[in-house]
Amino acid sequence: MPATLKNSSATLKLNTGASIPVLGFGTWRSVDNNGYHSVIAALKAGYRHIDAAAIYLNEEEVGRAIKDSGVPREEIFITTKLWGTEQRDPEAALNKSLKRLGLDYVDLYLMHWPVPLKTDRVTDGNVLCIPTLEDGTVDIDTKEWNFIKTWELMQELPKTGKTKAVGVSNFSINNIKELLESPNNKVVPATNQIEIHPLLPQDELIAFCKEKGIVVEAYSPFGSANAPLLKEQAIIDMAKKHGVEPAQLIISWSIQRGYVVLAKSVNPERIVSNFKIFTLPEDDFKTISNLSKVHGTKRVVDMKWGSFPIFQ
C-alpha cells in the first residue's frame, strides 16, 4: 500500500527559543538564474527555511527570489554562513551578506568551517575563495587566529539585531567541546550543520549535540552533487515498496531521526516532490539506519584542510 505523503510542516526549537523548520532548502551550487528560480520554486512549494552561504556566491539571487516570491520575510527562516577568510571580522562579513541578500537580518548565522584562512595571497580582493600556497595546499592561519576567537566575536552578533542566532557548521565533538570550554564562551551554538546521510549517520555527534542543546542540521542528505544515495539499491527497493521517490524516503528517514535536513534541487518537480514526507515503519527505518554497517561509512564532502583536525 502506498505511503501517505504530506507537506512538511514540523519545526524544532532552538536554544534561543526560536523555531526552525525541519525541512530546509539548500542552495549550494545553485547559481545565477538556477539559484533564483529554484528558491522561487521552493517558496512556492511551501518551504519556509532557506539555507545560503557567502561562499556559494549566490546570496544576491537568493535575496532577490525571497523578495520576488511574495512570501512575507517574517515567515521565512533564513540562514547564511561566515567564510574562513572573514573570520577575523564576522560582523563586517555579515553586513556584506545582508547587503547581498537585501535583508535587514538573518535568522541564523553559521561559522561555515572551524578553519580560519589567510588572505595574504589573495590578489584580486575577492576573499570569497579558498586561498592556497604555492604547493597547492590551503593557506590556513594556524598561528594568529582560531575558531575560538571567531566565536567570541560571533556570539555578540545577536545583540546587533543582524542575526537572531549564531551557530557552527562542520564541527566535530572535540571542536564543540573546545568551544564550549573556552574561558570567554557565553553562548552555546544554536545549531551544528554537518554532512549526514544513510552511509554517514553520525550517531555519536548527533547524540552529543542534542545533549548540549544544539540542533543538528544535515546537509548533503543524498550524498552531495551526484546524489549517490539515490542510486543505492536498498533505497530504491524500499522507495518502490512504499510508492515514494528515493529522495522522499531519505528525507523522511532524516526527519524521523530528529534533526533538520536540507534538501537541494534545481528541478522544479523535484523541489515540490522533496517537500512531501511520510512516516517510515520501524523495521524499514532501522534497515536504512543500518546501511552504513552493511556497506561501510562514506564521507562525501571530505574537504582537505591540511593538518587541521577537522573531523577528529
UniProtKB/Swiss-Prot annotation:
Chain positions recorded as substrate binding sites:
H112
* Site (Lowers pKa of active site Tyr) residue list: K81
Reactions catalysed, as given in the entry: a primary alcohol + NADP(+) = an aldehyde + NADPH + H(+); 2-methylbutan-1-ol + NADP(+) = 2-methylbutanal + NADPH + H(+); hexan-1-ol + NADP(+) = hexanal + NADPH + H(+)
Does the record's keyword annotation contain Cell wall biogenesis/degradation?
A: no
InterPro entries xrefs: AKR, AKR3A, Aldo/ket_reductase_CS, NADP_OxRdtase_dom, NADP_OxRdtase_dom_sf
Q: Which top-rank group of organisms is this from?
A: Eukaryota
Induction notes from the record: Is expressed during aerobic growth on glucose, and its levels are rapidly up-regulated by osmotic and oxidative stress.
For this UniProt record, the keywords arranged alphabetically read as follows: Cytoplasm, NADP, Oxidoreductase
Q: Identify the EC number(s).
A: 1.1.1.2
GO CC, alphabetical: cytoplasm; cytosol; nucleus
> What positions does the entry give for NADP(+) binding?
220-274
Q: A Pfam family for this UniProt protein?
A: Aldo_ket_red
Knockout phenotype, as recorded, reads: Yeast in which the YPR1 gene has been deleted possess 50% lower 2-methylbutanal reductase activity than the wild-type strain. This suggests that the enzyme may contribute to 2-methylbutanal reduction in vivo.
Q: Does the keyword Flavoprotein apply?
A: no
Instruction: Indicate the principal place this protein occupies in or around the cell.
Output: cytoplasm
Q: What does this protein do?
A: Aldehyde reductase with broad substrate specificity, catalyzing the NADPH-dependent reduction of aldehydes into the corresponding alcohols. In vitro, displays high specific activity towards 2-methylbutanal (2-methylbutyraldehyde), as well as other aldehydes such as hexanal (a toxic lipid peroxidation product and phytoalexin), but exhibits extremely low activity as a glycerol dehydrogenase. Seems to contribute to 2-methylbutanal reduction in vivo, and may therefore play a role in isoleucine catabolism and fusel alcohol formation.
Additional observations: Present with 14100 molecules/cell in log phase SD medium.
Listed name of the protein = Aldehyde reductase YPR1
The organism is Saccharomyces cerevisiae (strain ATCC 204508 / S288c) (Baker's yeast)
